[in-house]
């Protein structure tokens, strides 16, 4: 019974994936479908049509290689001009002091951030130890290890206490059932009368 259910769920997932891919192809721009070779769509930055130099009369989809390469039009060069956006004078009022301080300090150099105050340089550089070896010498000095040990010890202690309580409870229950003296026996012993001759 589980195998048909799994097959049904797999089929349902495949149908949903196929429907989603069909939906994605329907959202393509219809004006690009005439001039696209091999699924090559223009970038968002492109200006104008995908192939402005080709008209529907000149372009035959059967003559192309499918790679988007148009061999008949390789020698033609088309230049497009891109309007550069005007640089706006964007500033925050009251932020001029910080801008002026930043220009004076010049803390950025070749994409590297230089601290404002230089760290003091010691005369003997050979005594410096790398940060990897300055880790705590003992594993028990690390806070993560101590936290894990304390939590593990608490859980282990609780487990041991519950185990002992369970054993004591079972022993008491067993003892109560076998040594109960207040119960009357199920059968009565027949009286033995001895007759002396």
Curated annotation (Swiss-Prot):
* Extracellular topological domain: 20-147
Question: Which residue ranges does UniProt annotate as crossing the membrane?
Answer: 148-168
- UniProt cross-references to SMART domains, sorted A to Z: 4.1m
Which domain of life does the protein's organism represent?
Eukaryota
> What does the record say about PTM?
O-glycosylated; contains both chondroitin sulfate and heparan sulfate. Ser-38, Ser-65 and Ser-67 can all be modified by either chondroitin sulfate or heparan sulfate, and the protein exists in forms that contain only chondroitin sulfate, only heparan sulfate and both chondroitin sulfate and heparan sulfate.
What Gene Ontology terms for biological process does this UniProt record contain? activation of GTPase activity; cell migration; negative regulation of satellite cell differentiation; negative regulation of skeletal muscle satellite cell proliferation; positive regulation of protein localization to plasma membrane; positive regulation of protein tyrosine kinase activity; regulation of protein localization to plasma membrane; skeletal muscle satellite cell migration
Gene Ontology cellular-component terms listed: cell surface; membrane
Where does the protein end up? Membrane
Record's signal peptide: 1-19
Q: Which residues are glycosylated?
A: 38, 65, 67, 124, 136
Membrane topology is: Single-pass type I membrane protein
Name a Pfam family for this protein.
Syndecan
**What keywords were assigned to this record?**
Glycoprotein, Heparan sulfate, Membrane, Proteoglycan, Signal, Transmembrane, Transmembrane helix
Chain ranges sitting on the Cytoplasmic side read 169-197
Quaternary context: Interacts with SDOS.
What is known about what this protein does? Cell surface proteoglycan which regulates exosome biogenesis in concert with SDCBP and PDCD6IP.
Q: Which family does it belong to?
A: Belongs to the syndecan proteoglycan family.
Name the chain's protein.
Syndecan-4
Lineage of source species: Eukaryota, Metazoa, Chordata, Craniata, Vertebrata
Gene field = SDC4
